[in-house]
Amino acid sequence: MQLKHCHNFNDFRTLAKRRIPGPIFNYIDGAADDEKTYDRNTKSFDDCDLVPSILRGTETVDMSVTVMGQELNLPIYCSPTALQRLFHHQGENAVAAAAAKFGTMFGVSSLGTVSLTEVREKYKTPQCYQFYFHKDRSLNKAMLESAKAAGVDVMMLT
């Protein structure tokens, strides 16, 4: 299967499973702990129907939305994922570039492979920082100060 033949989530998942080494695919495809939250979230989509408005003009479609105080062109954002260079050589820079291209927000994990400052300097699109709280309060303080200095727009506590 080639990328140009991917038309839905399952197609992309099948392609990824074929191309990415097993342990890395399982990391991306899996979920935390017992995966109960993943199951509940997935099942909730069974109750959601996307119904297109047919025979209506598309010249004035506005998908912009405000999320966590950030103005986005799309009602989606690229969520933070740790260790992104495992599955793309540019890591967070690739996600930030895609988010900037489409005018949406992207997230950087505190377990990211690219520094907050580097990503922030290259891409001015809204950015959120997924912060893992540590027992070492001085480490927490340093990480929060670094995010603030980089100009991060939104903090997410994990």
Positions of the model-derived regions?
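Active-site-adjacent beta->alpha loops and helix N-cap segments on the catalytic face
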Residues: 88-90, 108-126, 134-142
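Internal gly/pro-rich beta-alpha loop/helix module
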Residues: 136-158
